[in-house]
Structure formats: structure tokens, C-alpha cells
Amino acid sequence: MMNLDMIMSTNLITISRKDNLARARELMHDNSIHHLPVCVDKELVGLVTLTNALAATDSILRDPDSRMHAKAILVEDMMVTDIATVDENASLRQAALFLEKHRIGCLPVVTDGELHGIVTDTDFVAVAINLLEQIEDTEPLEDAQPDEI
């Protein structure tokens, strides 16, 4: 059985809840990520998603009287705190089914209360591509003649 520890990202970019929207957007942009764990030490306390960041940005733009800008909105005011997590020993199948069922883009991997990694829908696409390539390598080509294989 393949476990999450085989595909999860462990070189994590995290943010503090006292950081601001501008910093969150900068980290997401510079690191090409859509999910930003919010940690106190190694404990996961929240999650900022690209969707959260865009919604917060949109709310600033819609209110012309607002004096708030990206530096004034704190991460703790826009982060999601009700976060589904998974243990690194969970199977890939279990995690993939959970992501699909709940229509979420990532699962932080938490063991003994500490954030150890994150697995995203992109990680599962990479697994699917790998499996498809393996199938293609083992199956004969449909259009090929027997002597061409």
C-alpha cells in the first residue's frame, strides 16, 4: 500500500497568523503554491488558500470607502480554522477519496499535533500521470502490428 509520506510535500512554506494578506499573496506567488499553512511553532492553526486571498482582495476592491488594504488584513482574520487533516500513514486511496468527496484541494499531514507535510490535488494528478505512463509501458500499442511490438 502506498502511503501519503511517499508523495506529500515536506519542504513547507508556512505563515504566521500575525502576517498580512500582502505577505500571504507574495509567498503564494513566489513559490507557485495555492495553500499556505498557518502555524504556531509546528502546530497547524489555520490555512490560507488562494481562494481566501482572492476573496479578501476582492472585498477590499468592492468597498471604495474602505481604508483597509492588503497590509492591514491579518492572516488570522481570513484563514480557515476548520481544517481536515490526515496522518502520514493514511493510504493514498483514502486521502484521494476524501479530497474528492469534500471537494477540497489539500490535506495537511499532521502527526502527533505537528505539521509534517501537505498533499494536494496536484500531487494526486502526478500519481495518476505516473500510473498512466506505467500502464502505457506495459500494454501493447493498439495500432501496432504484432511484429512492431
Residue ranges and their predicted role:
Residues 1-11, 49-84, 91-100, 120-149:
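Tandem CBS (Bateman) regulatory domains
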Residues 13, 20, 45, 84, ...:
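Glycine-/small-residue-rich active-site loops that bind phosphorylated ligands and cofactors
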Residues 15-32, 39, 85-103, 110:
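The conserved cystathionine-beta-synthase
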Residues 28, 36-52, 99, 107-123:
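A glycine-centered beta-loop-beta connector
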Residues 34-45, 64-72:
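Charged, low-complexity, helix/coiled-coil-prone segments
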